Amino acid sequence: MAQTLLATRQITKRYGSSVAVDGVSLTLQEGQIYGLVGQNGAGKTTLMRMMTGQTLPSSGELELFGETSPQGIDRMRANLGAVVETPSFFPFFTARENLEYYRRQRGIVGRGCIDDALRQVELGDTGSKKFKDFSLGMKQRLGLALALLNRPA
């Protein structure tokens, strides 16, 4: 049976009197691929922020890699990698320099992870090319490399 990576039980997020997410329960299993779709303003981003521990739910329970406490979730976030729709990179930095900047910002130990991430997304030979000169597909793959830097679970 696949391991549960993330589970939510009736999580809700309120901003004042406005309810952004209302009573969502779900379970994400290891080895599966999931998508999150919905209309604008439906709460997708808020749900993702709660699922990745960036914000806490107003009510309900979040379990991430078996941890339910806020402190445990902070520790477990090191096992996550996320790809955003529009990654923000420095245009005049190389791919390698951009990843090095984010590696340091996140406190990820070891420079080998940069070469590993670039190889995994087939950008190993473009590490010295400036981000501004990348094609759209290459920019998206660099965003994926960023998500792989900390070698997520």
Regions found by a protein language model. Give the residues of each.
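The feature captures the beta-strand-to-loop junction immediately N-terminal to the Walker
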Residues: 34-39
